[in-house]
Amino acid sequence: MELPVLRGERVTLRPVEEADLDPLSGVIQEPSVAQWWGEAEEPERLRHNLRMDGDAFAIEADGELAGWLGFVEETEPEYRSVSFDISLSERFQGGGLGPDALRTLVRWFADERGHHRFTIDPSMLNDRAIKAYAAVGFKPVGVMRKAELHDGEWADALLMDLLIDELR
């Protein structure tokens, strides 16, 4: 799918480009990001994870690359939903850019692609992310036990979902 450029209140979402891979690889190596993503990603692995075929947006703030927002879209009529992953550079965290990016993309998927349900699954240990997603309207719906490796130990992840009429 060819992705559009989307504008939120404070962010611009645009398709990830080849030139973004090295800077985004650097973002994933920052301590506050790496603790949730595991080992540092080389550009080739990052390219695969960002699904360079069109399933990720670069997040820009004030003209600077701030991070990325990936998605998996379920298009089967019986199961329509979109799942998200997001990562912001340390210097862009805590200012509301993540929630703005998520709101912007949720609205686009609802308005342009007909989706009504969205999910995200942060580590249960990532309080900052859980609060940010709750600010958008995501609600906890379950715990995925021992879902991800964190500091060499299996940790639970919190499954959160959002119905379009709950978007804040």
Give the residues covered by each predicted segment.
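Glycine-rich acetyl-CoA-binding "A-motif" of GNAT/NAT acetyltransferases
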Residues: 64-67, 128, 154
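A short, well-structured alpha-helix characteristic of acyl/acetyltransferase catalytic modules
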Residues: 1-51, 166-168
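Conserved GNAT acetyl-CoA-binding A-motif
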Residues: 112-121
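Conserved beta-strand-loop-alpha-helix junction that forms the acyl-donor binding cleft
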Residues: 120-130, 147-151
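Conserved acetyl-CoA-binding loop-helix of GNAT-fold acetyltransferases
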Residues: 94-108, 127-135
